[in-house]
């Protein structure tokens, strides 16, 4: 049923839709193979091209429904973490490490109730967007007097549309998060540069003040020494002028 639905979608959509449907079909085929839980398939799934965005949805990483319990999440984590652990896949250790990190990150995210709620909100938003879009299209078709049947009436194609929109929302949020982090990092860097500049300016001012005071003390000492030397010379000179006149002996006849 899924295969025929996807084939029909490929024939009716544009090139972008056809590409997505082909991709989605391949993903579903991989997921079907993954149901046997082999290390090779799981590592391939978690490290395939574009995995940095595909792995943003923690439920997709662990291949579980959003409605599962925390106990089921833990059980699934144990299964996948054992399968992709680098120690068990030493012939493909680098990719195994990357896959293990993706599984570990998804598991920890779902243990955090706040982050889990955010992920659920994104999934719900994707579903509501598709439902709204389908409703508007049906309304427009009815207005035009045309049959209101749309491809999303097929449950499998509806799931595909939700999957596509959800993946898009996760990607958009990740891009915004990175932009926000880059902006915050730039702001922290700017503030740090201003702090360093202020510290250097204060240091230069302290050094200038210190040098000024030291040179001022030197100038004062030089002036005092000059005054003392000048005064001493004057006193010595005055003492020279105050010498008593020589007494001339009177000669008697």
Curated annotation (Swiss-Prot):
Domain of life of the organism encoding this protein: Eukaryota
CDD domains for the chain: DnaJ
GO cellular component term, pick one: cytosol
Keywords attached to this entry: Acetylation, Chaperone, Nucleus, Phosphoprotein
Region (Essential for polyglutamine aggregation suppression): 232-253
Keyword field contains Acetylation: yes
J domain location: 57-124
Pfam families: DnaJ (PF00226)
Annotated disulfide bonds: none
Region listing for Disordered, in residue ranges: 181-253
Basic residues bias locations: 231-240
Modified residues (N6-acetyllysine): 146
Localization, UniProt: Nucleus
Motif (Nuclear localization signal): 189-192, 203-206
Modification type Phosphoserine: residues: 35, 222
Coiled coil residues, start to end: none
GO molecular function terms noted in the UniProt entry: Hsp70 protein binding
Complex and partners: Interacts with SRPK1. Interacts with HSP70 (HSPA1A or HSPA1B).
Protein name: DnaJ homolog subfamily C member 8
Species this chain originates from: Mus musculus (Mouse)
Phylogenetic lineage: Eukaryota, Metazoa, Chordata, Craniata, Vertebrata
